[in-house]
Amino acid sequence: PRQQILPIFLAQNDPPRQDRPVGDDVIDAEYPVTKQLTDVYEKFGNGVVGVQEVPREDVPKYCTLDVTPLEKNVMQVHDMLEKPSLSEIMSCYSILGRVVMPPEIFGIIENTPPVNGEVGFTAAMNTLAKQGRLNAVDFIGNRFDMGNKLGILKANCEMGLRHPELKDDFKAYLKELVSKL
């Protein structure tokens, strides 16, 4: 029942009693997204989720958040729902790519009942939200969705074109490949 959150759960004692940054997408940003989130974590002392606005029709692929602005690109999260129907959308802000959780998340996970046989990380984070202990950062950066094949290919191409040791050979390869299309 804990497959979705198993990697997070296994990290609870390594090292003990520290905040936990977690990410599952590649994000290209001058100001690293994890740093954007940890700065807010240190300022407010709450869990923090990295969010961006997505097109309304894409929200059901992710989650929806009920938020109020705090400052610049920082919001207070009041509620969230994973994979909502179009009629359940609270906003077009969705959690994308990064979160920083306080150590208490492990106790919350332990006490979160499974839904459809699975303990969801979103449900555990929503407990923090309902306690007023979750912030959202509308992060600055270009996100590559590692949840789909095209996102993986785009990230590899973009990063390959910037890699100091590979960029010239990779660019030549891409030009040759494109000429054959």
Give a label for each model feature:
Residues 69-172:
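Catalytic-core segments of class I nucleotidyltransferases/pyrophosphorylases
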Residues 170-173, 177-181:
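Intrinsic disorder at enzyme termini
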